[in-house]
Amino acid sequence: NVIVCGIRNISPQLSLEMAQLCVAYKGRGVIAFDLAGAEYDHPAKHHLEAFQLVRDNNICVTIHAGEAYGPESIHQAIHVCGAHRIGHGCRLREDGDLLHYVNDHRITLECCPSSNVQTGAVRDLASHPMKLYYDLGLRVTVNTDNRLITDTTVSKELWLAHTQMKLGPEEIGHIVLNGFKAGFLPFHVRQHFLREVSEEIEAIQSGNLEDHGTKPKARKVAAGDKSSAAKEAPSASDSP
Protein backbone atom coordinates (compact mmCIF):
# COMPACT_ATOMS: atom_id res chain seq x y z
CA ASN A 1 0.00 0.00 0.00
CA VAL A 2 1.16 3.52 -0.85
CA ILE A 3 0.87 6.83 0.98
CA VAL A 4 1.07 9.67 -1.54
CA CYS A 5 3.24 12.46 -0.13
CA GLY A 6 3.21 16.16 -0.89
CA ILE A 7 6.08 18.47 0.09
CA ARG A 8 5.65 21.64 2.15
CA ASN A 9 8.14 23.71 0.18
CA ILE A 10 6.73 22.98 -3.27
CA SER A 11 3.77 24.65 -4.93
CA PRO A 12 0.41 23.95 -3.26
CA GLN A 13 -0.87 23.35 -6.79
CA LEU A 14 1.48 20.39 -7.10
CA SER A 15 0.23 19.10 -3.76
CA LEU A 16 -3.30 19.37 -5.10
CA GLU A 17 -2.30 17.34 -8.16
CA MET A 18 -0.80 14.72 -5.84
CA ALA A 19 -4.06 14.69 -3.88
CA GLN A 20 -5.99 14.20 -7.11
CA LEU A 21 -3.82 11.18 -7.88
CA CYS A 22 -4.51 9.95 -4.37
CA VAL A 23 -8.24 10.11 -5.03
CA ALA A 24 -7.91 8.55 -8.49
CA TYR A 25 -6.04 5.55 -7.09
CA LYS A 26 -7.99 5.12 -3.88
CA GLY A 27 -8.74 1.43 -3.46
CA ARG A 28 -6.11 0.56 -6.05
CA GLY A 29 -3.05 0.60 -3.82
CA VAL A 30 -3.25 4.13 -2.39
CA ILE A 31 -4.38 4.39 1.24
CA ALA A 32 -3.50 7.88 2.51
CA PHE A 33 -2.05 11.34 1.87
CA ASP A 34 0.99 12.80 3.63
CA LEU A 35 2.84 16.11 3.78
CA ALA A 36 6.55 16.24 4.55
CA GLY A 37 9.42 18.68 4.05
CA ALA A 38 10.67 21.85 5.72
CA GLU A 39 8.28 23.10 8.39
CA TYR A 40 9.78 26.56 8.93
CA ASP A 41 8.17 29.14 6.63
CA HIS A 42 6.14 26.38 4.94
CA PRO A 43 2.98 25.86 7.01
CA ALA A 44 0.75 22.92 6.20
CA LYS A 45 -2.27 25.20 5.79
CA HIS A 46 -0.81 26.45 2.49
CA HIS A 47 -1.77 23.02 1.14
CA LEU A 48 -5.27 23.09 2.60
CA GLU A 49 -7.01 22.54 -0.74
CA ALA A 50 -5.19 19.22 -1.14
CA PHE A 51 -6.19 18.12 2.35
CA GLN A 52 -9.80 19.13 1.80
CA LEU A 53 -9.93 17.06 -1.38
CA VAL A 54 -8.61 13.86 0.19
CA ARG A 55 -10.77 14.25 3.30
CA ASP A 56 -13.86 14.86 1.16
CA ASN A 57 -13.07 11.50 -0.42
CA ASN A 58 -12.66 9.71 2.93
CA ILE A 59 -8.90 9.24 2.59
CA CYS A 60 -6.72 9.19 5.69
CA VAL A 61 -4.15 11.91 6.40
CA THR A 62 -0.77 11.92 8.12
CA ILE A 63 1.46 15.00 8.36
CA HIS A 64 5.08 15.46 9.40
CA ALA A 65 4.90 18.10 12.14
CA GLY A 66 6.58 19.16 15.36
CA GLU A 67 10.07 18.16 14.32
CA ALA A 68 11.75 21.38 13.18
CA TYR A 69 8.98 23.69 14.40
CA GLY A 70 7.01 24.02 17.61
CA PRO A 71 3.70 22.56 18.74
CA GLU A 72 1.87 25.17 16.66
CA SER A 73 2.78 23.07 13.63
CA ILE A 74 1.17 20.00 15.22
CA HIS A 75 -1.92 22.01 16.18
CA GLN A 76 -2.31 23.22 12.60
CA ALA A 77 -1.80 19.73 11.18
CA ILE A 78 -4.58 18.35 13.36
CA HIS A 79 -7.11 21.16 13.63
CA VAL A 80 -6.71 22.84 10.23
CA CYS A 81 -5.61 20.00 7.96
CA GLY A 82 -7.32 17.07 9.70
CA ALA A 83 -4.34 14.78 10.34
CA HIS A 84 -5.13 11.36 11.79
CA ARG A 85 -1.45 10.69 12.53
CA ILE A 86 1.51 12.97 13.20
CA GLY A 87 4.98 12.23 11.89
CA HIS A 88 7.63 12.97 14.53
CA GLY A 89 5.82 15.17 17.07
CA CYS A 90 9.03 15.78 19.03
CA ARG A 91 7.90 19.18 20.26
CA LEU A 92 4.43 18.15 21.35
CA ARG A 93 5.77 18.04 24.93
CA GLU A 94 5.99 21.85 24.84
CA ASP A 95 2.18 22.19 24.87
CA GLY A 96 0.54 20.19 27.64
CA ASP A 97 -3.01 21.00 26.59
CA LEU A 98 -2.40 19.87 23.01
CA LEU A 99 -0.62 16.77 24.30
CA HIS A 100 -3.71 15.83 26.29
CA TYR A 101 -5.88 16.39 23.21
CA VAL A 102 -3.66 14.12 21.12
CA ASN A 103 -3.80 11.49 23.85
CA ASP A 104 -7.55 11.72 24.41
CA HIS A 105 -8.29 11.43 20.68
CA ARG A 106 -5.75 8.64 20.13
CA ILE A 107 -3.90 10.55 17.43
CA THR A 108 -0.89 8.41 16.65
CA LEU A 109 2.66 9.77 16.85
CA GLU A 110 5.05 8.30 14.30
CA CYS A 111 8.29 8.62 16.28
CA CYS A 112 11.54 8.38 14.29
CA PRO A 113 14.36 8.29 16.88
CA SER A 114 17.50 7.95 14.72
CA SER A 115 16.29 10.42 12.11
CA ASN A 116 15.40 12.94 14.82
CA VAL A 117 18.96 12.76 16.16
CA GLN A 118 20.40 13.19 12.67
CA THR A 119 18.28 16.26 11.92
CA GLY A 120 18.95 17.83 15.32
CA ALA A 121 15.35 17.65 16.47
CA VAL A 122 16.69 15.99 19.63
CA ARG A 123 20.18 15.97 21.09
CA ASP A 124 20.48 12.20 21.42
CA LEU A 125 18.34 9.10 21.85
CA ALA A 126 18.32 9.44 25.62
CA SER A 127 16.63 12.85 25.33
CA HIS A 128 14.04 11.74 22.77
CA PRO A 129 10.49 12.26 24.11
CA MET A 130 9.10 8.92 22.92
CA LYS A 131 9.56 7.25 26.32
CA LEU A 132 7.85 10.22 27.99
CA TYR A 133 4.94 10.00 25.55
CA TYR A 134 4.66 6.27 26.14
CA ASP A 135 4.63 6.72 29.90
CA LEU A 136 1.87 9.32 29.54
CA GLY A 137 -0.23 6.83 27.56
CA LEU A 138 0.01 8.36 24.10
CA ARG A 139 -0.26 6.05 21.13
CA VAL A 140 3.33 6.14 19.91
CA THR A 141 4.84 4.05 17.13
CA VAL A 142 8.45 3.42 16.13
CA ASN A 143 9.41 4.31 12.57
CA THR A 144 12.40 4.83 10.29
CA ASP A 145 11.34 8.14 8.68
CA ASN A 146 13.46 6.86 5.81
CA ARG A 147 15.56 3.73 5.56
CA LEU A 148 18.17 4.83 3.02
CA ILE A 149 19.44 8.18 4.32
CA THR A 150 19.15 7.24 7.98
CA ASP A 151 20.51 3.74 7.25
CA THR A 152 18.08 2.01 9.56
CA THR A 153 15.16 -0.41 9.78
CA VAL A 154 12.15 -0.68 12.06
CA SER A 155 13.85 -3.61 13.80
CA LYS A 156 16.95 -1.51 14.46
CA GLU A 157 14.85 1.37 15.78
CA LEU A 158 13.01 -0.98 18.14
CA TRP A 159 16.34 -2.31 19.40
CA LEU A 160 17.56 1.24 20.02
CA ALA A 161 14.31 2.01 21.83
CA HIS A 162 15.06 -0.92 24.12
CA THR A 163 18.79 -0.38 24.63
CA GLN A 164 19.08 3.41 24.49
CA MET A 165 15.64 4.64 25.52
CA LYS A 166 15.01 2.11 28.29
CA LEU A 167 11.79 0.63 26.96
CA GLY A 168 11.35 -2.93 28.22
CA PRO A 169 10.27 -5.99 26.19
CA GLU A 170 6.63 -5.69 27.26
CA GLU A 171 6.62 -2.00 26.37
CA ILE A 172 8.18 -2.77 22.98
CA GLY A 173 5.41 -5.31 22.41
CA HIS A 174 2.78 -2.68 23.15
CA ILE A 175 4.49 -0.29 20.77
CA VAL A 176 4.57 -2.87 17.98
CA LEU A 177 0.83 -3.45 18.41
CA ASN A 178 0.20 0.27 18.16
CA GLY A 179 1.61 0.24 14.65
CA PHE A 180 -1.14 -2.16 13.67
CA LYS A 181 -3.82 -0.26 15.59
CA ALA A 182 -2.82 2.92 13.76
CA GLY A 183 -2.68 1.33 10.33
CA PHE A 184 -4.55 2.98 7.48
CA LEU A 185 -6.31 -0.29 6.73
CA PRO A 186 -9.89 -1.57 6.98
CA PHE A 187 -10.97 -2.42 10.51
CA HIS A 188 -11.28 -6.16 9.86
CA VAL A 189 -7.76 -6.25 8.41
CA ARG A 190 -6.34 -4.50 11.46
CA GLN A 191 -8.23 -6.96 13.67
CA HIS A 192 -6.70 -9.88 11.78
CA PHE A 193 -3.15 -8.55 12.12
CA LEU A 194 -3.66 -7.63 15.77
CA ARG A 195 -4.78 -11.16 16.63
CA GLU A 196 -1.84 -12.74 14.83
CA VAL A 197 0.78 -10.35 16.15
CA SER A 198 -0.61 -10.42 19.70
CA GLU A 199 -0.31 -14.22 19.73
CA GLU A 200 3.21 -14.08 18.35
CA ILE A 201 4.35 -11.46 20.86
CA GLU A 202 2.85 -13.48 23.70
CA ALA A 203 4.63 -16.61 22.48
CA ILE A 204 7.97 -14.80 22.17
CA GLN A 205 7.69 -13.22 25.61
CA SER A 206 6.71 -16.53 27.21
CA GLY A 207 9.43 -18.43 25.35
CA ASN A 208 6.85 -20.82 23.89
CA LEU A 209 7.60 -20.79 20.18
CA GLU A 210 6.51 -24.36 19.37
CA ASP A 211 3.32 -23.30 17.62
CA HIS A 212 4.91 -20.27 16.00
CA GLY A 213 8.11 -21.69 14.53
CA THR A 214 11.63 -20.95 15.65
CA LYS A 215 11.78 -17.64 13.86
CA PRO A 216 9.26 -14.78 13.98
CA LYS A 217 7.22 -14.60 10.81
CA ALA A 218 7.73 -11.65 8.50
CA ARG A 219 4.92 -9.15 8.94
CA LYS A 220 3.60 -6.26 6.98
CA VAL A 221 3.91 -2.98 8.85
CA ALA A 222 0.28 -2.09 9.27
CA ALA A 223 0.69 1.65 9.54
CA GLY A 224 1.28 1.66 5.82
CA ASP A 225 4.61 3.41 5.54
CA LYS A 226 6.61 3.24 8.69
CA SER A 227 4.90 2.24 11.90
CA SER A 228 5.45 -0.31 14.63
CA ALA A 229 4.39 0.87 18.28
CA ALA A 230 2.82 2.70 22.42
CA LYS A 231 1.14 2.19 25.62
CA GLU A 232 -1.72 -0.17 24.89
CA ALA A 233 -2.51 -3.56 26.37
CA PRO A 234 -1.51 -6.33 23.92
CA SER A 235 -5.03 -7.27 23.00
CA ALA A 236 -6.54 -8.37 19.73
CA SER A 237 -9.09 -5.57 19.83
CA ASP A 238 -8.62 -2.29 18.02
CA SER A 239 -9.90 -0.23 20.94
CA PRO A 240 -7.77 2.38 22.72
Positions of predicted regions on the chain:
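Short, solvent-exposed polar/charged micro-motifs at secondary-structure junctions
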Residues: 11-14, 121, 182-184
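Mid-to-C-terminal alpha-helical segments outside catalytic/metal-binding sites
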Residues: 166-234, 239-240
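His/Asp/Glu-enriched, well-ordered alpha-helical/loop segment
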Residues: 56, 60, 78-85, 103, ...
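Generic, ordered loop/turn and secondary-structure boundary motif
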Residues: 91-93, 118, 123, 149-150, ...
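Active-site beta-loop-alpha junctions enriched in small/polar residues
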Residues: 3-9, 35-40, 64-68, 89-91, ...
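Short secondary-structure boundary/hinge segments and terminal tails
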Residues: 72, 95-96, 119-120, 151, ...
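Histidine/acidic residue-rich metal-binding segments in metalloenzymes
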Residues: 1, 13-32, 39-63, 67-82, ...
